[in-house]
């Protein structure tokens, strides 16, 4: 899947964007940049923004704070050397943030994240330090029946992601993922996205409409069409 994405999916999407004059942001892994430098050079040459997306698509929730910091530092270094400037955007692998992610991003000068879904069509300031009590069925119920406590807003903007504006769940087949599909047509996906866009256009005077596509799914002919 990864080799197809780099060798076939990326060039096809770049041709599509060039044909319609679309400028995009690519969340890329450091591993992909180092493995396929000639492919990713074309993304930069076409004027698209490069954001960080882990080194090997590591889940932040599965890492220690030191591991997460090392992954961020390595990926930022790879992209900075490749593009000639430090990335300012972050798209978390799996769209998961650990309790340490926000602080680590701010320490490294990241200006925005695009992984969370507290809103759907409007940017918002992220908070650091949200807390809630997890359910532990081995304990008395009173131990977890406590409200969520919001943390403090920080200077890190969230451009909200959305599973309903993501091509992967409906168009990408992955054997180990119970919710993967892969047999939804591009026309069906376009209809869902068009309905959302029409609703936003009618109900908001200001909004962002952030679509997420992947070269290993959107780069397939039946989706491109």
Residue ranges, per PLM feature:
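Acidic-and-aromatic substrate-binding clefts and catalytic sites of carbohydrate-active enzymes
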Residues: 2-7, 25-37, 58-69, 91-100, ...
């Amino acid at each position: 899947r990864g080799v197809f994405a780099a060798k076939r999916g990326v060039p096809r999407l770049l041709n599509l964007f060039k044909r319609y004059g679309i400028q995009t942001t690519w969340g890329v892994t450091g591993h992909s940049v180092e493995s396929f430098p000639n492919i990713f050079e074309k993304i930069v040459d076409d004027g698209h923004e490069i954001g960080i997306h882990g080194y090997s698509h590591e889940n932040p929730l599965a890492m220690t704070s030191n591991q997460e910091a090392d992954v961020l530092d390595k990926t930022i270094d790879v992209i900075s050397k490749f593009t000639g400037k430090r990335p300012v955007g972050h798209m978390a692998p799996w769209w998961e943030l650990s309790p340490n992610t926000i602080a680590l991003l701010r320490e490294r000068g990241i200006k925005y994240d695009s992984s969370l879904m507290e809103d759907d069509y409007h940017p918002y300031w992220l908070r650091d330090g949200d807390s809630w009590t997890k359910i532990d069925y081995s304990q008395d119920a009173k131990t977890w029946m406590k409200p969520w406590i919001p943390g403090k807003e920080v200077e890190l903007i969230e451009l909200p992601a959305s599973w309903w504006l993501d091509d992967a769940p409906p168009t990408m087949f992955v054997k180990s993922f119970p919710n993967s599909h892969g047999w939804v047509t591009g026309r069906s996906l376009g209809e869902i996205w068009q309905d959302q866009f029409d609703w936003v256009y009618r109900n908001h005077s200001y909004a962002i409409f952030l679509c997420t596509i992947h070269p290993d799914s959107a780069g397939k002919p039946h989706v491109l069409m």
